[in-house]
Amino acid sequence: MRHASVDDIPVLAHHRVAMFRDMGQLAPELKDALQRATASYLDDALPRGEYLAWIAEDSGKPPTAIGGAGVQLRPILPRPRTAADLELGPEAIVLNVYVEPAWRRRGVAETLMRTVLDALASRGIQRIVLHASDAGRRLYERLGFVLTNEMRLGR
């Protein structure tokens, strides 16, 4: 497991495309456009620290990326977390948790997520959200994520 750099943008973009493809949410004709748009976003966001990413690799020589995960950081207004405590920003949005099919069901996603959560805790980030796929929901629940009342405008 290692922290990703701008040199890893092609792998990170590939994982994002593969994730949406595997969930059945990507029309084949959008694959190249999503790959380019993702790479363009990461080219700006990674150096600015607005997006953090990790790569899981096999033990080959040279190692091959077998999975990855990312976090988009966004500022939030301070708000009460409890009656006696404030929740300060930024908010971390976990994105693009992806494991290559041949490596699934071997604990790679859990290791990625524990790495992400440890890194965010070390930065003092209190609010962590994600959108769970059906395949990932049990893992996220085991890690302590709970359903919320968040809603989205359906346009």
Residue ranges and their predicted role:
Residues 1-14, 25:
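A short beta-loop-alpha structural element at the N-terminal edge
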Residues 55, 63-73, 93, 98:
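Conserved beta-strand in the GNAT
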Residues 76-82, 129-135, 141, 146-155:
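Conserved catalytic-core motifs of GNAT/GCN5-like acyltransferases
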Residues 81-101, 153:
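Conserved acetyl-CoA binding element of GNAT-fold acetyltransferases
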Residues 103-115:
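Conserved acetyl-CoA pyrophosphate-binding loop and the N-cap/start of the following alpha-helix
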Residues 113, 120-132:
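Conserved GNAT acetyl-CoA-binding A-motif
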